[in-house]
């Protein structure tokens, strides 16, 4: 699109948080026609707003009032359940540890929200994500200036065509500057904590939440020699590298070193734990992925030397990426990686450019 800003209508996904609020303010300052949209993605049915949806809506309304813009609302809870939450449960049932934020971006924020915004007459949508997009030629997903807050890890699965109609107004800002702008603008949320964790779980214990939807299957915990050293409550409640909550201690044959989850044996319903943070079973050098989702739908020539992350905010890790057939890749890291977790995502970078990623299927 080549419209001038004053002729360009942008609908900002406003969560009630400081980031999306400042995103809207920056677009107004740049001369765009701006409206907000508050989306509700989870219908609480237990009488408690774990998602703090009502508080968040009030915060978004306060900001919209200060900015003098219209605030739309939309309920995407049905789409969220069908496209995100059902997959989340299926992955946990299969013993993997999914990342629903990645799927939420792909299916809700950059699909359902974008489609709805277009029906409202938007030329673009905008969000408070810390990311940048190059709109020269084919859209490229670029890291944010604030590398500590960069969220390209969570955006890698979004179809690149969606970025042609997306603006990221915070991509060139550091977080402290965002809070300063919010305070300067008179936003009540300028000191509001960043949201953490999964919205629909909120402050509840993860185990308490998950057992509402999936029946637990308790079983044995074994050490790396096959000795039974405890009992687990259900494999789905544990993630690789986890230390807390194992209930192992005081074994006469063991040292005082802490125990960590090293593996899940799904066939036997056994959790395997090892002692010591540097135990070899906690590390892997190679992973195999599910089919890749390249941002530009074009894979680089493989094998390729790239950097990768297997979790958010992890420092870039050097690796060689090789074609494994059927759209999958094999990743060989320069250094062994700790607690690489099936169900999570590996995301690839070439300098500042986020190339894409895939769900981790297995490690070696």
Swiss-Prot record:
A UniProt-annotated Pfam family: tRNA_Me_trans_M
SUPFAM superfamilies: Adenine nucleotide alpha hydrolases-like
Principal cellular location given in the protein's record: cytoplasm
Cysteine disulfide links: 104-199
Top-rank taxon, per record: Bacteria
Record-level GO BP terms: tRNA wobble position uridine thiolation
Family matches, as InterPro entries: MnmA-like, MnmA-like_C, MnmA-like_central, MnmA-like_central_sf, Rossmann-like_a/b/a_fold
Protein's name in the database: tRNA-specific 2-thiouridylase MnmA
Organism for this UniProt entry: Alcanivorax borkumensis (strain ATCC 700651 / DSM 11573 / NCIMB 13689 / SK2)
Gene: mnmA
